[in-house]
Regions:
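Amphipathic, non-transmembrane alpha-helical scaffold segments
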Residues: 7, 60, 64, 68, ...
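Membrane-interface segments of envelope glycosyltransferases acting on lipid-linked substrates or membrane lipids
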Residues: 2-5, 14-15, 49, 118-119, ...
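Residue-level detector of anion-binding/catalytic polar loops
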Residues: 45, 77, 126
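Conserved small/polar residues in nucleotide/adenosyl-binding loops
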Residues: 189-191
Length: 191
């Protein structure tokens, strides 16, 4: 199975995937970011499809088609989103239906969207965590593959809680990716 990682930030999730000895065929980024340096250090091919090239009236469908075209060049079977900052459109999810994994910093279905950590704090929960799920056109709505709980401390702020969630995520996500790839190879997952 050929895995692509989509990243937009520091590359810490990509690093966790590599550190777990998961082969990554290519990393695709949507902007200049720190992940590129990390990818180059690990000698993984890196593609940039900059969202700024799609004008002030961002064409999400065209961008998604360009992402699919770029990944097709690498014969990608499975995609792991790793802090990817652009919401993709139907052409992407049609091309990789049931084979796009994502991680979210909350225990879905609670606190979906961009501000899961902040929302958990504002609601006063004592437990939050991270979720690995199949990404679909409906953001944070896909089937849940794995979750891990993280305690919320009384003195937590968004940054401290998010860092503990990310630490847990860096263990959970690679383990879930490995299991997903193995199950897919053994045809235990039907796409």
């Amino acid at each position: 199975m050929r895995l692509a990682v989509l990243a937009s930030g520091t590359g810490s999730i990509y690093k966790a995937i590599i550190d777990a000895n998961i082969d990554v065929a290519v990393v695709l980024v949507d902007r200049l970011c720190a992940a590129i340096d990390l990818v180059n250090t690990n000698q993984t091919p890196c593609i940039t499809v900059e969202r700024t090239q799609f004008g002030p009236e961002f064409d999400r469908t065209k961008f998604s088609c360009d992402v699919v075209a770029a990944l097709t060049e690498f014969n990608i079977d499975v995609v792991a989103m790793a802090g990817f900052g652009t919401v993709l459109d139907a052409p992407f999810f049609e091309a990789y239906e049931g084979r796009v994994l994502n991680t979210h910093p909350a225990l879905l279905p609670s606190f979906p969207g961009w501000h899961g950590v902040r929302d958990a704090l504002q609601h006063g929960v004592k437990i939050t965590g991270c979720t690995v799920h199949i990404a679909t056109l409906d953001v944070d709505e896909g089937p849940i593959l794995a979750q891990a709980a993280v305690e919320v401390f009384d003195d937590d702020n968004e940054a401290t809680l998010h860092e503990r969630i990310k630490s847990t995520e860096r263990d959970l996500y690679p383990a879930t990716i490995k299991k997903f790839l193995t199950d897919l190879e053994l045809s235990l997952i039907h796409i």
